[in-house]
C-alpha cells in the first residue's frame, strides 16, 4: 500500500507556524529567548526517541498531547512564548510538524539577521579551522554571513556536499565515483 507524501503539507504548515512565532517574538523583543527555547527543545528531541515518537504520532488525542506538552515544558523549564506556542501546536494537532517549524524558525531568524544557513555534509567531522574557512568561502560567494550545520555521513567517502538555499555543491567522492562509473559504462 503506497504511503501519501505529506512532506509538502508538513512544510507549508511548519513555515506558517514558524513565521507566526517569529513575528510575535520580534514584536515582543523575545527572538533570542525563543531561539534558546527552540534549541533546548530540539536537543530534547534529539536525545529522546520517546519524545520524537510522541511528537510524530497521530495516535494521541489533542487533549493528551496538550497535557504532555505542558508537563514536558514545565519540567524542561520552557516558558513564555515558546511554551504557549507549543500549547497551540498541540491543541491544533500539529506536533508532527514541530521539527520543520524549528528549522523554519531558524531560517527566518537568520534571514532577519542578514545571515544565510548552509547545510554541509562531510565524510568526517570538520575542524574549527575547516568550518571557519568554509564560512569565509561561502560568504565570498553569497555576500552574507553564513551559519553552517554540519552532518557527518561516512557514505559520501570524502569531500563535501554543501546546500545553500536552492543551490547544492556536491564534491563528494561518492558522486565523483558514480559519474566515473557512468562514463565508463558509456565507453565500454
From Swiss-Prot:
Keyword Transport tagged: yes
Cell location: Cell inner membrane
Listed GO MF terms: proton-transporting ATP synthase activity, rotational mechanism
Any one of the GO CC terms: plasma membrane
SUPFAM superfamilies tied to this protein: N-terminal domain of the delta subunit of the F1F0-ATP synthase
InterPro entries reported in the protein's UniProt record: ATP_synth_OSCP/delta_N_sf, ATPase_OSCP/d_CS, ATPase_OSCP/dsu
Record's keyword terms, sorted: ATP synthesis, Cell inner membrane, Cell membrane, CF(1), Hydrogen ion transport, Ion transport, Membrane, Transport
Protein's membrane topology: Peripheral membrane protein
Pfam families: OSCP (PF00213)
PROSITE patterns listed in its UniProt record: ATPASE_DELTA (PS00389)
Domain of life according to the entry: Bacteria
Function recorded in the entry: F(1)F(0) ATP synthase produces ATP from ADP in the presence of a proton or sodium gradient. F-type ATPases consist of two structural domains, F(1) containing the extramembraneous catalytic core and F(0) containing the membrane proton channel, linked together by a central stalk and a peripheral stalk. During catalysis, ATP synthesis in the catalytic domain of F(1) is coupled via a rotary mechanism of the central stalk subunits to proton translocation. This protein is part of the stalk that links CF(0) to CF(1). It either transmits conformational changes from CF(0) to CF(1) or is implicated in proton conduction.
UniProt family annotation: Belongs to the ATPase delta chain family.
Subunit and interaction comment: F-type ATPases have 2 components, F(1) - the catalytic core - and F(0) - the membrane proton channel. F(1) has five subunits: alpha(3), beta(3), gamma(1), delta(1), epsilon(1). F(0) has three main subunits: a(1), b(2) and c(10-14). The alpha and beta chains form an alternating ring which encloses part of the gamma chain. F(1) is attached to F(0) by a central stalk formed by the gamma and epsilon chains, while a peripheral stalk is formed by the delta and b chains.
Name under which the protein is recorded: ATP synthase subunit delta
Source species: Rhizobium johnstonii (strain DSM 114642 / LMG 32736 / 3841)
